[in-house]
A protein has these predicted regions:
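Intracellular juxtamembrane helix-capping segments at the cytosolic ends
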Residues: 1-11, 195-208
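Hydrophobic/aromatic end-of-helix segments at the C-terminal termini of transmembrane alpha-helices
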Residues: 2, 106-118, 200, 204, ...
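Helix-loop-helix hairpin linking two adjacent transmembrane segments in secondary transporters
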Residues: 12-74
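Interfacial helix-cap and linker-helix signal at transmembrane-aqueous boundaries
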Residues: 35-45, 118-119, 151-152, 234-246, ...
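Multi-pass alpha-helical transporter architecture, strongest
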Residues: 63-70, 268-291
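Extracytoplasmic gate region of multi-pass secondary transporters
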Residues: 89-143
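C-terminal transmembrane helical hairpin of 12-TM major facilitator-type secondary transporters
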Residues: 155-203
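A late C-terminal transmembrane helix in Major Facilitator Superfamily
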Residues: 210-246
Length: 291
């Protein structure tokens, strides 16, 4: 609901507003990771239930703020008068939903697994993996969105180069023998994927005007599905590869455990999402060029 609300607000630069909105997610992510890591490290993991209660408080405050806020008038459905080509419009929305799905896959595969990956595949202590891996991932994700809000333009090129960058980073994470280089690549994924979710919303607003709240709901569903599907898929891949005989044999050659082989193979498979994203964006450029 927040995205269409912000989009409905009068603004001289709606792209900037959308980017700033989504940058707050990154800053919140950083806060949660650092506070939770320090709490579990110094207070004790046995007191985790108090941490859960603590993080329930911001949600309560957010609910109160949303309840008392004055919301702008929003277009709940598309305007038939302004709809020139319904078939083209519907296809455009489907393409945008597919794009945000792939973007969410690329972003959340790493954000969900970076802590476990640095601990198990790179043999780093969990506390350092959380702080230097997950936290820096979120910091750069937030800073990139903030930077785009101030200086960014040409969202199509941003999305395309972001997908390409994500492909490169995932490949480095998967095949690099250096733990430091792999960790840096994990963090840089945060930069590359930072604009994929908000950027697709911006692209939709530019190419499919007067979409209405329903379109934002579809976009949110596509993004949420990608954020769930990709990390779960990686988990299934890691579990199955780790117990395979060929993973044991490869591990003996590369001096890796079967689980480490599973993680690296999973990260290599994860490149399929940004690769498909590059192909999709190339098609979308042709599609919108015919509008």
């Amino acid at each position: 609901m927040v995205s269409p609300t912000v989009a409905a607000l009068p603004s001289d630069n709606p792209e900037s507003d959308m980017s700033v909105l989504h940058s707050l997610y990154g800053y919140g992510f950083v806060g949660v990771v650092i506070v939770s890591t320090l709490f579990l490290q110094f207070v004790g993991k046995e007191h985790w239930m108090y941490l859960t209660l603590f993080w329930a408080v911001p949600s309560i405050f957010a609910s109160v703020l949303l309840f008392i806020a004055k919301l702008p008038d929003m277009n709940m459905e598309q305007d038939e008068v302004k709809t020139v080509n319904t078939k083209h419009r519907t296809k455009s929305l489907v393409l945008c939903v597919a794009c945000i799905f792939l973007g969410a896959c690329a972003e959340n595969t790493m954000s969900n697994w970076i802590s476990v990956y640095t601990e198990n595949a790179l043999n780093m202590p969990k506390v350092w993996g959380d702080i230097f891996g997950m936290s820096f991932f979120a910091i750069f994700l937030a800073l990139t969105r903030t930077f785009y809000a101030k200086y960014g333009k040409n969202i199509y090129k941003v999305l395309t180069f972001s997908m390409i960058g994500a492909v490169v980073c995932y490949v480095i994470v998967a095949i690099s023998p250096s733990a430091i280089i792999s960790l840096i690549a994990c963090v840089v994924v945060g930069i590359c994927t930072s604009m994929l979710w908000p950027g697709t919303l911006i692209l939709m607003e530019e190419k499919v005007p007067e979409v209405g709240v329903a379109a934002y709901a579809l976009m949110a569903a596509g993004g949420d599905f990608g954020a769930s599907f990709a990390p779960q898929t990686l988990g299934v891949i890691v579990d199955n590869v780790s117990v395979s005989e060929w993973a044991v044999n490869i591990g003996l050659v590369l001096s890796l455990t079967p689980e480490q082989v599973g993680f690296k193979f999973g990260m290599l498979i994860a490149t399929i999402f940004p690769i498909l994203g590059v192909i999709l964006l190339a098609y979308m450029k042709k599609h919108f060029g015919q509008a």
